[in-house]
Swiss-Prot record:
Keywords of this entry: ATP-binding, Ligase, Metal-binding, Nucleotide-binding, Queuosine biosynthesis, Zinc
Catalytic activity as recorded in UniProt: 7-carboxy-7-deazaguanine + NH4(+) + ATP = 7-cyano-7-deazaguanine + ADP + phosphate + H2O + H(+)
Entry protein name: 7-cyano-7-deazaguanine synthase
Record-level GO BP terms: queuosine biosynthetic process
Organism: Erwinia tasmaniensis (strain DSM 17950 / CFBP 7177 / CIP 109463 / NCPPB 4357 / Et1/99)
Gene giving rise to this polypeptide: queC
């Protein structure tokens, strides 16, 4: 039996990964992390989506100690969420240091226990938001460290790594779940479900990608299929 663990936040990217995993694996588990995020609604959204999509099990793990160590506008009310600024440089205030190191490692431990072969994450380098822990180089390095530390060949899969946001929308549409992704996921840094606030960087990236896909659905779909091997 093919088992996978999806690192699941209830946002656009991880929900798209979950939808695909349910098509490609016999048994899918989700792991969501409570890291003291300021918008607790994302945990509720993740629980609702995992239940409605029919995953085998959904674990919410407490890693709130991360909030004590890593200050970020996603975890601290006194650090404002910045509006989208294409000229911004350096690490954004929304970066949570060590978050994906913790998430992927804990998900790997869970995968080890249930004898899953893959950990799936929505990390993406193409629409790079300044997060070093979303880079392909980082994921591969951590995957190697996990396998060495556990003496087991686990795979950290990143189905969206080389897709832009328009192609991520196309992938959702390929699996006939674009409306669910658009209206029921929570990607917004200000905690607004669906199309979000429209002002933060996450909402801007999501809306721009949807617009690009809707303008050229056939060509974007073909490019997504070429990149993912779904053609």
């Amino acid at each position: 039996m093919k088992r996978a663990v999806v690192v699941f936040s209830g946002g656009q990217d991880s929900t798209t990964c979950l939808i695909q995993a349910l098509e490609q694996y016999d048994e899918v588990h989700c792991v969501t992390f409570d890291y003291g995020q300021r918008h607790r609604a994302e945990i509720d959204v993740a629980q609702q989506l995992s239940a409605s999509l029919g995953v085998r099990a959904h674990k919410v793990l407490d890693v709130t100690m991360l909030n004590e160590l890593a200050a970020s506008s996603l975890t601290r009310d006194n650090i404002p969420v910045p509006a989208y600024d294409p000229s911004a440089s350096g690490l954004p205030s929304t970066f949570v240091p060590g978050r994906n190191i913790v998430f992927f490692t804990f998900a790997s431990i869970y995968a080890f226990q249930i004898e899953a072969e893959a950990i799936i994450t929505g990390a993406c380098e193409t629409d790079f938001s300044g997060y070093p822990d979303c880079r392909d180089e980082f994921v591969k390095a951590l995957n190697r460290a996990v396998n060495l530390g556990m003496a087991r060949e686990l795979r950290i899969e990143t189905p969206l790594m080389w897709l832009n946001k328009a192609e991520t929308w196309a992938l959702a549409d390929y699996w006939q779940q674009l409306p669910l992704i658009r209206h029921q996921t929570l990607t917004c840094y200000n905690g607004i479900i669906g199309d979000g606030c429209g002002d933060c960087a996450a909402c801007h990236l999501r809306a721009r990608g949807l617009d690009q896909y809707q303008q050229n659905p056939t060509s974007v779909m073909l490019e997504m299929e070429r990149k993912t091997g779904l053609a």
